[in-house]
Amino acid sequence: MKNSSKIFVVLSIILFYVISSCHGYNPFAKTVVTVTNNISPQTTLTISCRSKDDDLGEHLLLHGQAFLWKFRPSWFRTTLFTCKFLWNNNVKWFDTYRSDRDQGHCYSCNWSINADSACISGNFNKKFDRCYPWN
């Protein structure tokens, strides 16, 4: 019985990994989120991002500059990173990574921050074709 239990556990783990990989989700891979300031050439963007577990600090981005971080999403699809954006007299908030929206769709999440929205191009797509209004 002991050997059959071990074999069952090993086969279950392998099956989970194979099914997850077939659906575009690798539970062991790190996700990269990149946020780029594309507001206007003379605008400096202050960005401050955090999750429940991590505070990534405050960063100043000149036009065209980017800030990125890497992490492993939770297997339970609860990972959430929220960023606060400040420029001129504007203060905006946005979820730059939400497991329910992004996990399995974007391992390299590239955000273009504009004055009226945040736009994403996922993985190898270079077009910022999905835009979301500010929270």
UniProtKB/Swiss-Prot annotation:
GO terms for biological process: rejection of self pollen. The keyword Secreted applies. It is found in: Secreted. Pfam families: Self-incomp_S1. The keyword Signal applies. Residues 1-24 form the signal peptide. Its main location: secreted. This is S-protein homolog 29.
